[in-house]
Regions:
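Short hydrophobic/aromatic-rich motifs at helix boundaries and adjacent loops
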Residues: 1-3, 111-113, 198-200, 207-208, ...
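Intrinsically disordered, low-complexity boundary segments flanking structured domains
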Residues: 1-2, 187-188, 284-290
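Amphipathic alpha-helical transducer elements in NTP-driven molecular machines
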Residues: 2-5, 27, 39, 64, ...
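Extreme N-terminal "head/tail" segments of very large remodeling/mechanoenzyme assemblies
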Residues: 3, 7-15
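Short, flexible, solvent-exposed loop/turn segments with mixed acidic/basic and small polar residues
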Residues: 4-7, 44, 253-254
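Acidic-enriched and Gly/Ser
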Residues: 11-12, 19-218
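Switch/coupling sub-region of P-loop NTPases
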Residues: 218-324
Length: 324
């Protein structure tokens, strides 16, 4: 943890103003320590004014007061990308809800944060790259199957320039933290690559050769949509409507029948009842292509309307980053 410590000088709802001495960056993550307890509330810098930073807190701020300390991490809000995302249910900060329930019970405690991906589960890794090859960001080093989907283990997106593959792990089972490849830069630096990548949610991924324009329709198998309101594969569409109009039902139908590899549902600002309905129905929906449960190729991110605004906003960025 960084030694950059700030002091709270004002609290207003889920916003707090923090005074700091050392440099702080926009969108940096910090942890507000609640009174004299060990509870640490995750927050993010949204504005910097001189030596004061306005921060939005992702949890209920009851008990937070002037004089409490804030630990700045020096890192931006980021999500973990790698095998283990499918079939999982996360909150807006990518905490796995089933694991949170096991640890905290029915009532989640503030300040509880878990790793998004299971560190103990082993995945079958198959190398693709060979030692001596030249690679760059987003090049494939190997593959890992998860259900019907195959993950590509890529050169980290943050790297720039050309790298030489020093070594690649042989085919076998590894967890997401084990090193599966070593890359060497032109200046001699060595980069160790694992199956998991951290990527800031508010930084666009630029490691692509070209941006493809949507040219094909996405077949939703809903006649009125495919006939009168066709959706482009790789495009965007909106379902506006009042309460009870069937927005969530249409979302379920699209998720079940659309010709896609992965389904990611972000229940952002939904009523709690609709989120519960989603969690109950998706494991029971059958994938027409495989005959197995749709949940095997689905990731759900839950942030109900009762959650703080900051957490609901973060869930949108989290969902989009995982999708990319």
């Amino acid at each position: 943890m960084s030694e950059n410590i700030g002091t709270i000088v004002g609290v207003n709802g889920n916003l707090m103003t923090v005074q700091f001495d050392q440099p702080v960056t926009q969108n940096e993550v910090g942890y507000a320590r609640l009174g004299g307890t060990e509870t640490r509330l995750k927050s993010e810098v949204i504005r910097i004014r001189g030596n004061n930073a306005d921060m939005q807190v992702y949890e209920d701020t009851a008990g937070l007061k002037v004089g409490d300390k804030v630990e700045f991490t020096g890192n931006l809000l980021a999500v973990e990308l790698g095998p283990g995302l499918l079939g999982q249910v996360f909150d807006g900060l990518q905490n796995p809800l089933p694991e949170l329930a096991e640890q905290c019970g029915f009532f989640l405690q503030r300040g509880t944060y878990l790793k998004a991906l299971d560190r103990t589960k082993k995945w079958a890794f198959t190398p693709v790259a060979k030692p001596g090859e030249t690679v760059e960001a987003a090049d494939t080093l190997g593959t890992v199957p998860e259900g019907i989907f195959t993950h590509r283990i890529m050169v980290p997106f943050r790297l720039t320039g050309k790298y030489t593959v020093e070594s690649v792990a042989p085919a076998g089972e590894y967890n997401v933290e084990q090193v599966i490849a070593k890359l060497k830069a032109a200046n001699g630096d060595t980069v160790e690559v694992t199956m998991v990548q951290l990527w800031p949610v508010k930084v666009p991924i630029r490691a692509y050769a070209e941006r493809l324009r949507p040219t094909e329709p996405l077949v939703t198998k809903v006649r009125i949509i495919d006939t009168f309101f066709p959706v482009a594969r790789g495009g965007v569409y909106c379902i506006p409507g009042p309460f009870g109009a069937g927005k969530t039902v249409l979302q379920h139908i699209t998720s079940k029948n659309a010709d896609v590899d992965i389904v990611l549902v972000a229940a952002c600002g939904e009523r709690a009842g609709e989120v519960v309905e989603t969690l109950r129905e998706f494991p029971e929906l059958i994938d027409p292509r495989t005959g197995r449960t749709l949940m095997e190729r689905t990731t759900i991110i839950c942030n109900t309307s009762s959650m703080p605004v900051a957490a609901r906003e973060a869930s949108v960025y989290t969902a989009v980053t995982i999708c990319e």
